[in-house]
Amino acid sequence: MSERAPVVTVDGPSGAGKGTISQLLAERLGYKLLDSGAIYRVLALAAIHHNVELDNEEALTLLAAHLDVQFVTGNESKGIKVVLEGEDVSITIRSQECSNAASKVAAFPRVREALLRRQRAFAEAPGLIADGRDMGTIVFPTTPAKLYLTASAEERAQRRYNQLQDKGFDVNIDQLLSEIKERDDRDMNRSVAPLVPAEDALIIDTTNINIEDVLDLALTHIHQKLQVPA
């Protein structure tokens, strides 16, 4: 496939800094943003809103094909705003109900295919930053501008620990580290769309470098690949 507009893919494991870098890149370049990790949760919430049964593959597929969702940047302190049918659902989609429902809708092959097409439709002028786990390998494999962010499991656990502590949650860092390692193993070894860098991706290890340096590396790569101002 070929994209209708410039696309930058940002893949990698949880906690590597994808979300932060994707938001900063979208703001710096004036590009649209796709948070693919939220897509299934958004679809699940849309199904709940429209009284679509979570075992109705045909209805879910139709809903997925016309999913009215936007990812809005511009408030770095609050992160990306997820808007479904004009309503801010950034907090709602993180509920356990949405999480459980997302797992159910993701089980249907036709729903996954419809959401794949829907994600590709985000590639519109002036450009797109696509944040996910298989953006460069499955969703936008032909874009020349691919980034893969990674960091040690220990560093990612520490970042997650700090985030949860800041939000008032009482968490155990050893448990977080164990969960991250288990998810890494599951994601990297699954048979469908495993978490691996695209062959032509720029791999950035964010373990020991600050966000400004990561951003500089990313912008330089994008400038070289897409010929856009860095």
Curated annotation (Swiss-Prot):
One of its GO terms (biological process) is pyrimidine nucleotide metabolic process. Its EC number is 2.7.4.25. Gene3D superfamilies: P-loop containing nucleotide triphosphate hydrolases. One of its GO terms (cellular component) is cytosol. It is an enzyme of class 2 (transferase). CDD domains: CMPK. ATP binds at residues 12-20. This is Cytidylate kinase. It comes from Shewanella pealeana (strain ATCC 700345 / ANG-SQ1). The lineage of its organism: Bacteria, Pseudomonadati, Pseudomonadota, Gammaproteobacteria, Alteromonadales.
